[in-house]
Amino acid sequence: MSNDPSVLYAARKLYKEYRLQGISVPVLKGVDLEIRRGEILSIVGLSGVGKSTLLNILGLLDSPTRGGLAYWGRDEEFHGRDVAALDINDKSRLRNRDFGFVFQFYHLLPDLNVLENVLLPAMILRSVKAFRANKALLTDRASELLRRVGILERRDFPPNRLSGGERQRAAIARSLMNDPELVFCDEPTGNLDTVTGHRIHELILELNGELGTGFVVVTHDRGLARLAHRTLSMRDGLFMNHHN
C-alpha cells in the first residue's frame, strides 16, 4: 500500500459497521491512515466517533467490515499481505510479538504480582518449555522495564497495593515486554488526576526517545495530544485534519 520506507503501518478505506436490533450502524466510514516508524501519533475526538474502534482494528483485536491493513514490521512474512485478513492464529502471533497495549483501567491481573504481570506477554508468546528455559533473562528484562518506568521497588507487590499512576506504569512496562514496534494506548490518562497524567505523558515521551517504540494514543487529554509528533482529529467516523 505504501512505497515510503518510513511508513510502518497503513490502513486503507476502513469501514466498520455494527448490527443493532437488525439495523446497520456505521462507525468507521472509509478511514485512511499511515503510521510512521517510531512516531507518537495521537487520535482525538468526541466519544462515539470511532477512535477506540479504529484502535482495536489496528491492534488486530477486531476486524473491519471492509478495507485493508498493510504492515511492514520486523517479520517480512507479513509484508505485502492484508493483515486484517489473517487467520486468528497469525493475527495472535503478530499481535503478541509486535504490538503492545495500554488501557484506561490497566487490566492487571489481581492474583499476580507486578513483575508477573509484566512477564505475561512473554509467557503468552512462548511455549512453556521456552519460557522456562529463558525465564532468568526474561525476568531481567521485566525488571529493567520496571526500573525504566520508575516502580522497580514495587515488583513484588500485588496490583491493589499500587496507586493509579503506578498501575498505569506497570501496564506500560507490560506493553513493552516483547519489544513491540507499536504500543496502542486507549485513554491511558483517562482514569488519572492531572498531575499523575502529566507524569504518564512524560514517561511515554521518554520511552519513545530511548527505545524508538511507536505509540498510537487515543485520548481526550489535549495535553497528551500536544506532546505527539502528529495529532489526527476524528469526527463521524473519519479523520478531519492532520497536524504535523
Protein language model features and the residues they cover:
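ABC-family P-loop ATPase nucleotide-binding domain
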Residues: 1-17, 241-244
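H-loop (His-switch) and adjacent beta-strand-loop-beta switch element
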Residues: 231-243
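ABC family nucleotide-binding domain
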Residues: 8-227, 231-234
